[in-house]
C-alpha cells in the first residue's frame, strides 16, 4: 500500500467539524449564539401539526372568463372598424354570438375577426343572421393548464405574505392542488386567504334601469342584479340591491399595489394603486362618467358604489366596505397577489394537532434511537475494534445528513425519519461488506495495510452498484411523489451520498492511519 496522502486525513477532520457546526442548530434548537448558522431542518406537517388542504381548480370557470374576454375583444374590434350589428352576447362558456343587421358588412366582419382572433373558430350562419365565435380546443387546453399553474403561483404569493414558514404547495394531477401549512395558528383565516378568488371589477351602475322590475326578474340584457353590503343601524350588515351593467370597464389585473389604511372615521379601508395602463383607464373613466355611480365589485359582491364627483388622476382608488382591520389586511394581500384565474373548491381538509405531531416526533426519535443502539451493539460484539470504527462512521454519517438537510432547509417528515432509520442499516451494511473482504485478504496471508487496500478496492464496486440503484429509485420517488414521499426520497438520497463517503473514504483513511501509526503487524476482525 502506498503512503497515504495527508490531505485525506485533513479532509475527514474538516468534514467532521463542518458537519457538527451546521448540524448543531437543528439538534439543539432554542436560542443559539449569533455566530451559529441560522439554517435548520424544519418539521413537516405530520411532526408539528398544521393544516392539509386539497383543492380542485374549477378550470371551466377560466374558460367561461376567456369567453367573456372574447366578447370584449370582438366588440372593440367591430367598434374600431365601425361595423354595425344588432347585438353581441356570450352563449355557454366558450361561444360568442354576434347578431347581424341587414346593413352589416358580413364579409368585412368575418375577415377582421378571423385575422385578430386566430385561436378561435369564426363561423357565419346565414339563416340566423349570426356570426359565432368558438374557443378552439387547443386554446381551451392551454387555458386549463395556465389556470392551475397560475393558481399555484398566486397561492404561494398569498401564503408568503401571510407569513407561514415552510409551506408546501404542489400540483396533483391536472387540476388539483395540495397545500400543507405546518404550525398554522388560524386555519379558518388561512383557508379564507387561499380560497378567495379576489376578482376585482369596476362597473357602472345602471341608474336608468328599473330596479323594482329587475327585482321581479325582468333584468335588462346588458345589466345584472348585484347586492351591496352596508352596515345596519342595529349592528351587523344588510344587503342593498343595485342594477349594474355587466361590462367591466376596469379590472383588478391592473393593480400594482394594495395597502391597508384608514378613512376620516378611522375605519379600515384598502388603498389600491394602478399600473400605468390602469391609471390612464381609471382617469378616463372617472372623467367621462362624472355624477354617475361606479360600483367596485369584489368576487361578485358590490363593496361600494360611490358617485364620481370629479376626474381622478394619479392612478389611485380606495375600497371600503365595513371591514375589520384583519379583513382589510387580508384583502390587501390577495389584491397584491392577484386574482385567482378560477375558483377553488376544497375536496379534502385535515387538521393535525400539535399533540399528535409531538407524539409522532417522540415515536420517530425512539425508533432512531432503538435502531441505532441495536446496530451499535451488534457491530461492537461481532467486529470489536472494527465495529467501533464502523459506529463512529455511522455517527458521522448522521451528522453529515443532518447538516446537509439543514443547509438545504429541508422539511423533515415521518417518512423522512423512516429513511434515516433505513440508512443506519445501509451504512453499517457497507462496512460489513468491507470488513468481510479484509478478513478474506488476511486469510490469504497479506499484511494489514495490503489487506485493507485490497479489501476496500474489491468491495467498492459492490457498494457502488447497490447505492446507485437505490439512488435511482429515490430520484424516481422524488420526481413523481408528493409531500411525505418526497421527504423520504430527499432523506434517502442525501443519506446515501453521506453513507458512501463515510464507509468508503472515512473508515479507510482512519483505519490506514491507525495501522500505520501503531505499526500493527496483525489485525483481528
From Swiss-Prot:
Entry's Gene Ontology molecular function annotations: protein-transporting ATPase activity
Subunit architecture: Forms a complex with SecF. Part of the essential Sec protein translocation apparatus which comprises SecA, SecYEG and auxiliary proteins SecDF-YajC and YidC.
InterPro entries, per the entry: Acrflvin-R, SecD, SecD/SecF_arch_bac, SecD_1st, SecD_SecF_C, SecD_SecF_C_bact, SecDF_P1_head
Annotated GO CC locations: plasma membrane
Full protein name: Protein translocase subunit SecD
Functional description taken from the UniProt entry: Part of the Sec protein translocase complex. Interacts with the SecYEG preprotein conducting channel. SecDF uses the proton motive force (PMF) to complete protein translocation after the ATP-dependent function of SecA.
Highest taxon of source: Bacteria
Keywords, in A-Z order: Cell inner membrane, Cell membrane, Membrane, Protein transport, Translocation, Transmembrane, Transmembrane helix, Transport
Species annotation: Magnetococcus marinus (strain ATCC BAA-1437 / JCM 17883 / MC-1)
Pfam family, one: SecDF_P1_head
Gene of this entry: secD
Membrane topology type: Multi-pass membrane protein
Assigned protein family: Belongs to the SecD/SecF family. SecD subfamily.
Amino acid at each position: 500500500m502506498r503512503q497515504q496522502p495527508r490531505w485525506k486525513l485533513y479532509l475527514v477532520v474538516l468534514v467532521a467539524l463542518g458537519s457538527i457546526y451546521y448540524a448543531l442548530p437543528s439538534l439543539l434548537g432554542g436560542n443559539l449564539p449569533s455566530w451559529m448558522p441560522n439554517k435548520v431542518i424544519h418539521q413537516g406537517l405530520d411532526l408539528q401539526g398544521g393544516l392539509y388542504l386539497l383543492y380542485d381548480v374549477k378550470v371551466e370557470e377560466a374558460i367561461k372568463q376567456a369567453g367573456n374576454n372574447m366578447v370584449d375583444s370582438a366588440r372593440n374590434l367591430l367598434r374600431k372598424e365601425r361595423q354595425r350589428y344588432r347585438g353581441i352576447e356570450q352563449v355557454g362558456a366558450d361561444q360568442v354570438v354576434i347578431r347581424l343587421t341587414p346593413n352589416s358588412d358580413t364579409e368585412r366582419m368575418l375577415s377582421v375577426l378571423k385575422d385578430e382572433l386566430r385561436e378561435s373558430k369564426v363561423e357565419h350562419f346565414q339563416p340566423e343572421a349570426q356570426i359565432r365565435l368558438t374557443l378552439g380546443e387547443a386554446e381551451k387546453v392551454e387555458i386549463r393548464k395556465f389556470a392551475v399553474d397560475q393558481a399555484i403561483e398566486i397561492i404561494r404569493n398569498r401564503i408568503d405574505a401571510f407569513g407561514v414558514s415552510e409551506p408546501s404547495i404542489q400540483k396533483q394531477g391536472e387540476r388539483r392542488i395540495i397545500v400543507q401549512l405546518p404550525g398554522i395558528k388560524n386555519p379558518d383565516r388561512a383557508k379564507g386567504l387561499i380560497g378567495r378568488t379576489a376578482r376585482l371589477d369596476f362597473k357602472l351602475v345602471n341608474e336608468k334601469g328599473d330596479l323594482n322590475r329587475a327585482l321581479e326578474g325582468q333584468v335588462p340584457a346588458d345589466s345584472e342584479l348585484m347586492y351591496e353590503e352596508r352596515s345596519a343601524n342595529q349592528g351587523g350588515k344588510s344587503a342593498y340591491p343595485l342594477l349594474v351593467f355587466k361590462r367591466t370597464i376596469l379590472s383588478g389585473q391592473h393593480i400594482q399595489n394594495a395597502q391597508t389604511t384608514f378613512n376620516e372615521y378611522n375605519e379600515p379601508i384598502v388603498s389600491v394603486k394602478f399600473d400605468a395602463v390602469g391609471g390612464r383607464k381609471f382617469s378616463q373613466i372617472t372623467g367621462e362618467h362624472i355624477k354617475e355611480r361606479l360600483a367596485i365589485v369584489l368576487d361578485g359582491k358590490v363593496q361600494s358604489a360611490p358617485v364620481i364627483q370629479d376626474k381622478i388622476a394619479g392612478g389611485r382608488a380606495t375600497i371600503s366596505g365595513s371591514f375589520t382591520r384583519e379583513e382589510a389586511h387580508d384583502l390587501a394581500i390577495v389584491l397584491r397577489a392577484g386574482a385567482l384565474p378560477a375558483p377553488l373548491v376544497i375536496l379534502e381538509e385535515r387538521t393535525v394537532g400539535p399533540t399528535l405531531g409531538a407524539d409522532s416526533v417522540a415515536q420517530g426519535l425512539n425508533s432512531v434511537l432503538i435502531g441505532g443502539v441495536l446496530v451499535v451493539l451488534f457491530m461492537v460484539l461481532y467486529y470489536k475494534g472494527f465495529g467501533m470504527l464502523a459506529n463512529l462512521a455511522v455517527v458521522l454519517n448522521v451528522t453529515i445528513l443532518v447538516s446537509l438537510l439543514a443547509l438545504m432547509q429541508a422539511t423533515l417528515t415521518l417518512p423522512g425519519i423512516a429513511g434515516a432509520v433505513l440508512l443506519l442499516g445501509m451504512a453499517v451494511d457497507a462496512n460489513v461488506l468491507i470488513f468481510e473482504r479484509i478478513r478474506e485478504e488476511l486469510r490469504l496471508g497479506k499484511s494489514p495495510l495490503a489487506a485493507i487496500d485490497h479489501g476496500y478496492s474489491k468491495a467498492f464496486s459492490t457498494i457502488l452498484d447497490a447505492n446507485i440503484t437505490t439512488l435511482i429509485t429515490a430520484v424516481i420517488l422524488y420526481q413523481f411523489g408528493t409531500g411525505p414521499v418526497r421527504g423520504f426520497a430527499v432523506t434517502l438520497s442525501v443519506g446515501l451520498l453521506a453513507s458512501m463517503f463515510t464507509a468508503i473514504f472515512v473508515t479507510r483513511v482512519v483505519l490506514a492511519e491507525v495501522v500505520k501509526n501503531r505499526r500493527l503487524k496483525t489485525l483481528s476482525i
